[in-house]
């Protein structure tokens, strides 16, 4: 989140969504003549694709709003799978973003770049977040899932990088490593045999990047 969550002079309480989520947002954005969200559309290990209403639901909201979706009762649901556009978590992003639009009296103008495996821009979409999201997902879906493959495989060899997504140390932290692998299982499930095995190449040197995640060793 990019807001100071204790600076209540610069936060606006927008009440609750129809689903009961408390929405509090950044007052600078609320008061702006034009509200612009700039980011990317890329498959996340959780919560579906990045971009769209996910920007505002996590980036300019309050911890009370974030606690409606980044919690076990949402992230441990059966519909909680990586790179999904239809889950409770994704729906909460949309609901909170639309609540912000309703109370601001204006729509978010969203500009998202669809990224490839090396985070290069392969397509850019701009417009109202509600209409732009599904358009960007079409190309992101082609990049993320292996639509062209037909054969099923017994073995998948995967190189686990040390530095990805949130920062250095993710590929050597066992919790985040398992999360990254689960995302690959979802991506490739269609071409995996019933007894498929992942062979993962990783440094496995115990590096947790304690400066960034001081709590993960205990966790």
Residue spans for each PLM region:
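Active-site glycine-rich loop that binds ribose-phosphate moieties when present
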Residues: 13-25, 90-93
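Structural motif
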Residues: 36-38, 154-159, 199
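C-terminal catalytic subdomain
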Residues: 169-171, 175-219
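A generic local secondary-structure boundary/capping motif
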Residues: 21-32, 44-48, 95-101, 143-148, ...
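Short acidic, glycine/serine/threonine-rich loops at helix termini
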Residues: 11-14, 46-51, 121-126, 168-170, ...
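Internal metal/ion-chelating core segments
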Residues: 31-120
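Membrane-embedded hairpin module used as a gating/binding unit in multi-pass transport
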Residues: 82-167
